[in-house]
């Protein structure tokens, strides 16, 4: 059964009526096929209208949709011969970061991804997509490995933020994130990052300081969650919608501000309605971007990458 968001109620009612008609075994005088077609067209128009004017808070809900494709789906759809590697060679393993070598369209790459999980058991295993220090150190280790072996890096980001627990802080969470960003900037190979759902704070940028940052049409990318921002500025998480509007967290705003480089279109109604179509569109965007980066020398890649991130915000009005 499809999960509908609050603002999708008109579409939910239409689709429920369509399903009811399709289940009818004795249509009587009703022309079921014609009625279903009319209602389907109406539902599509309603969906197009709704998704053509989503607010930042509504986009946040879409980015968090439980049926939205996760990192495992993207990897399964785009990467062959994927071999996940474990451990930071210092403390332990963190399943929130799923990473290892594989092939993209037949060519070897290094994949770094943050996995939220898709049911209760997997969400607990992957810590709801909030990496600990050992996860970021594993990512750094594999980015450095990619540099040694000349493998382009593809990262897929979906996290509300790094794990903020006391144990993570005790093991150097801030240092792990900072060194992760440094490893991204220093990588002598092409690096493409994609925000596939949520991109939350330093926990996201630790694997997203890339040559090219792609972002799904209804994903979000911000320094803090809207609820967290509202709790700080208004001391009330109920102001999350207002915070989302103020923070400019949508792909459209971030493209305009120069934070991301390209928006990957989603199927009508969001990636959760047709995950395979969304993943195919992402694969096409990566395939179009990678050759241009692969043509650059390592020093040119590093220089352009650093220049890109140092330039962010310099031309914005204060």
Curated annotation (Swiss-Prot):
Keywords recorded for this protein, A-Z: ATP-binding, Cytoplasm, Fatty acid biosynthesis, Fatty acid metabolism, Lipid biosynthesis, Lipid metabolism, Nucleotide-binding, Transferase
Annotated pathway: Lipid metabolism; malonyl-CoA biosynthesis; malonyl-CoA from acetyl-CoA: step 1/1
SUPFAM superfamilies (alphabetical)? ClpP/crotonase
Q: Mind telling me which InterPro entries this protein's record contains? A: Acetyl_CoA_COase_a_su, ClpP/crotonase-like_dom_sf, COA_CT_C
Q: Which Pfam families match?
A: ACCA (PF03255)
Q: What is its EC number?
A: 2.1.3.15
Please give the superkingdom of this protein's source. Answer: Bacteria
Q: Which reaction does it catalyse?
A: N(6)-carboxybiotinyl-L-lysyl-[protein] + acetyl-CoA = N(6)-biotinyl-L-lysyl-[protein] + malonyl-CoA
Location in the cell: Cytoplasm
Respond yes or no to whether keyword Transferase is given for this record.
yes
User: What's the family?
Assistant: Belongs to the AccA family.
| Protein purpose | Component of the acetyl coenzyme A carboxylase (ACC) complex. First, biotin carboxylase catalyzes the carboxylation of biotin on its carrier protein (BCCP) and then the CO(2) group is transferred by the carboxyltransferase to acetyl-CoA to form malonyl-CoA.
Q: Which PANTHER family match?
A: ACETYL-COENZYME A CARBOXYLASE CARBOXYL TRANSFERASE SUBUNIT ALPHA (PTHR42853), ACETYL-COENZYME A CARBOXYLASE CARBOXYL TRANSFERASE SUBUNIT ALPHA, CHLOROPLASTIC (PTHR42853:SF3)
Q: How does it assemble?
A: Acetyl-CoA carboxylase is a heterohexamer composed of biotin carboxyl carrier protein (AccB), biotin carboxylase (AccC) and two subunits each of ACCase subunit alpha (AccA) and ACCase subunit beta (AccD).
According to UniProt, the name of this protein is Acetyl-coenzyme A carboxylase carboxyl transferase subunit alpha
The encoding gene: accA
């Amino acid at each position: 059964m499809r999960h509908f968001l609050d603002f999708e109620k008109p579409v939910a009612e239409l689709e429920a009526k369509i399903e009811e008609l399709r289940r009818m075994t004795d249509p009587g005088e009703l022309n079921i096929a014609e009625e279903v077609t009319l209602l389907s067209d109406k539902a599509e128009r309603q969906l197009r209208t709704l998704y053509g004017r989503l607010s930042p808070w509504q986009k946040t809900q879409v980015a968090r949709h439980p049926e939205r494709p996760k990192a495992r789906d993207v990897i399964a759809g785009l990467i062959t011969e994927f071999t996940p590697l474990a451990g930071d060679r210092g403390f332990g393993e963190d399943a929130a970061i799923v990473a290892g070598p594989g092939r993209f369209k037949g060519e070897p790459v290094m994949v770094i991804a943050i996995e939220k999980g898709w049911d209760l058991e997997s969400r607990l295993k992957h810590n709801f997509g909030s990496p600990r220090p050992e996860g970021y150190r594993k990512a750094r280790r594999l980015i450095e490995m990619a540099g040694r072996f000349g493998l382009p890096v593809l990262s897929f980001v979906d996290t509300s933020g790094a794990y903020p627990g006391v144990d993570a802080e005790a093991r150097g969470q801030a240092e792990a994130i900072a060194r992760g960003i440094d490893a991204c900037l220093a990588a002598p190979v092409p690096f493409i990052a994609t925000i596939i759902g949520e991109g939350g704070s330093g926990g996201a940028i630790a694997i997203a300081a890339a040559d090219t940052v792609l972002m799904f049409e209804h994903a979000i990318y911000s320094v803090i969650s809207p609820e967290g921002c509202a709790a700080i500025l208004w001391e009330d998480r109920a102001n999350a919608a207002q915070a989302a509007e103020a923070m400019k967290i949508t792909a459209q705003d971030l493209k305009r501000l120069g934070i991301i480089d390209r928006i990957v279109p989603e199927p009508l109604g969001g990636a959760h309605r047709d995950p395979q179509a969304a993943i195919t569109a992402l694969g096409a965007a990566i395939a179009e971007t990678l050759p241009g980066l692969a043509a650059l020398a390592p020093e040119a890649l590093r220089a352009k990458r650093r220049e890109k991130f140092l330039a962010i915000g310099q031309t914005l009005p204060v």
